Amino acid sequence: MYYPLLSIALGSVLGAWLRWFLGLKLNPIYPQIPLGTVTVNLVGGFIIGFAMAYFAHSDLNPNYKLFVITGFCGALTTFSTFSIEIVTLLQSGKWGMAMLAISIHLIGSLIFTCLGLATYYWVAGH
């Protein structure tokens, strides 16, 4: 019971530290498009794709999958989870569902970000 939790926790710590470090080092280079954020999203997408394929053909203990995918990639970027879900839909020939999911994720995230900002300003009385 504790090994899955520890696997996720350790992966999360390392993923979060890497995200923070890359943000510190890369975001100031070109602030209009934060390169640290772009980097973690692209690297996270690559890692989760590689890991999903690898673990599908591996006899390794499932805790390693939890460490890499749920922990590390989850903390590094949630974009990697989104990416693998969309690719899975596309591989299944569900193009319409993939496009719908992309639209919901992207537009929905922007809307909810705006709602979060508006809620703060409303609650704070600004």
Curated annotation (Swiss-Prot):
It is a multi-pass membrane protein. It catalyses: fluoride(in) = fluoride(out). Keywords: Cell inner membrane, Cell membrane, Ion channel, Ion transport, Membrane, Metal-binding, Sodium, Transmembrane, Transmembrane helix, Transport. The chain crosses the membrane at residues 4-24, 33-53, 67-87, 97-117. It is found in: Cell inner membrane. The keyword Cell inner membrane applies. The keyword Kinase does not apply. Na(+) is not transported, but it plays an essential structural role and its presence is essential for fluoride channel function. GO terms for biological process: cellular detoxification of fluoride. GO terms for molecular function: fluoride channel activity; metal ion binding. Its main location: membrane. Na(+) binds at residues 74, 77. One of its GO terms (cellular component) is plasma membrane. It comes from the Bacteria. InterPro entries: FluC. Fluoride-specific ion channel. Important for reducing fluoride concentration in the cell, thus reducing its toxicity. HAMAP family: FluC. Belongs to the fluoride channel Fluc/FEX (TC 1.A.43) family. This is Fluoride-specific ion channel FluC. It comes from Acinetobacter baumannii (strain AYE). The gene is fluC.
